[in-house]
A protein has these predicted regions:
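Short, small-residue-biased leader/transition segments that mark boundaries at the very start
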Residues: 1-7
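Outer-membrane beta-barrel translocator domains and adjoining extracellular loop/strand segments
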Residues: 97-100, 157-163, 185-192, 230-238, ...
């Protein structure tokens, strides 16, 4: 059927990753006697303003889908609804050590002799295949606006799970999306869906504002829904939170592919003590510096550095370990925030318009305070992540890639484990 043909054309079948950008070619004025009618048009026939808003990827990362090829638009070309997505299939082979996840987290490299003695592992994954709806438009009072929802199949039992649902207008973002203590455009390309273990990555419900009225500058503030992942025991529990998280950022751009961004976040984390029969709060904070820039026309650099206390939920590797707040061994019935950091540095080289290669090294580190971890010296202290990959844009709708990953996990006991993975 025609509907089936349209659906097939707007989906991407990929091995490893995603669709490529398609840009507007020219503006076509569509005449219609019915003022409230809508039309199904290809992207190059929509208005220039609609295409510009639809193609904006300033708040998306490498793994996110691009604008759909076909749109539903009103006859004046001021509003458009895109329905699209992609199918993403990966094959993974671990050797000389495994990671207990389809994503490559060094924190999840299992301890030797922990019940699984296999050193090799084969997996396939299609759960990051994505569907989305994107409504864009331009009005007199709201200016450019976007309503975006997207999801993949990472829910329980590979069910559909919401990944983004937000509205943007006049610089405001309201809804569920990537957190403000991130820099999406500074993330390097990877087939691995998690990416560098020392990068900041999380999603949250938020009210944020971004000002870009000054040339080359962006300023942002946000209020975010708190989510605290801590280590508890019989005397300590984490339940109700009393304060939102607050984040701020400033970014300077000197061309469309180069910027430096500084960010900060502060959070108050509430826990209850059965020993004192009272609720307490521990304060966490994070500082971030990130960048991406052109070294030459074919060479791009990526980098990020994060440091703080109680920000484990925001950092890729540490988000698996419940270390936002942990028991204080020196103070019974109390919890503490630990210092932690994460960073990465990477390069991408474009061999030709359709082929590029990249490599990234990343590190995540958790520090000890007040005797932590006194009861478990095999707790995570440091993780390292190394990735090298190559991508080929076979066509405007198909991209394939191959990737090598190596990870190391070092515990407070100084014991180290490692794993290797091939992705394609």
């Amino acid at each position: 059927s025609a509907a089936s043909d349209v659906y097939k054309r707007q989906m991407l079948l990929g091995i490893g990753i995603f669709p490529l950008c398609a840009y507007a070619q020219q503006k076509v004025v569509i005449e219609d006697e019915e003022p409230n009618s809508i039309m199904f048009v290809s992207k190059n026939k929509a208005g220039d303003e609609i295409i510009r808003i639809m193609n904006d990827r300033s708040q998306m990362r490498f793994h996110d889908p691009n604008a759909p090829r076909f749109l539903l638009t009103d006859q004046k070309g001021k509003f458009a609804l895109g329905i699209g997505g992609y199918v993403r299939a990966t094959a993974e082979y671990d050797f000389n050590g495994i990671v207990n996840d389809v994503d490559f987290y060094p924190a999840l490299i299992p301890q030797r002799g922990s019940g699984n003695f296999a050193k090799n592992q084969f997996q396939m994954d299609i759960t990051t295949s994505t569907l989305f709806l994107k409504l864009v438009g331009r009005t007199k009072h709201l200016g450019d606006f976007v309503v975006y929802t997207a999801g993949n199949f990472r829910g329980d039992g590979k069910t559909f799970e919401l990944q983004n649902a937000y509205a943007q207008f006049l610089g405001f973002t309201i809804g569920y999306s990537y957190g403000s203590f991130m820099d999406l455009s500074a993330l390097p390309p990877t087939i691995d869906f998690a990416g560098p273990n020392g990068s900041a990555f999380y999603r949250t419900t938020q009210l944020s504002y971004m000002c870009d009225k000054l040339k080359n500058w962006k300023f942002g503030v946000s209020m975010e829904m708190p989510s605290v992942d801590g280590t508890t025991n019989n005397d300590l529990s984490i339940n109700t939170q009393r304060m939102p998280d607050f984040a701020t950022s400033v970014q300077y751009n000197w061309n469309s592919s180069s910027h430096v961004k500084l960010g900060a976040i502060v959070r108050s984390m509430t826990y209850s003590s059965n020993v004192h029969e009272k609720a307490y709060s521990a304060t966490g904070f994070g500082l971030q510096a990130s960048t991406t820039f052109n070294i030459t026309k074919k060479l791009q650099a990526f980098g990020q550095f994060n440091y703080g206390k109680g920000i484990g939920s925001y950092l890729n590797d540490l988000s698996n370990l419940n270390v936002d707040i942990v028991p204080d061994p020196d103070n019974e019935g109390k919890m503490q925030v630990l210092p932690m950091l994460g960073w990465y540095a990477g390069l991408q080289y474009n061999l030709c318009p359709s082929i590029f290669i990249s490599g990234t090294y990343s590190l995540s580190r958790l520090y000890s305070e007040n005797g932590y971890p006194s009861e478990n010296p095999e707790s995570y202290r440091k993780g390292q992540y190394l990735v090298a990959n190559a991508f080929w844009n076979v066509s405007s709708n198909l991209q394939v890639g191959v990737e090598y990953l190596r990870g190391w996990r070092t515990d407070f006991s100084s014991a180290t484990r490692h794993a290797n993975r091939l992705n394609m």
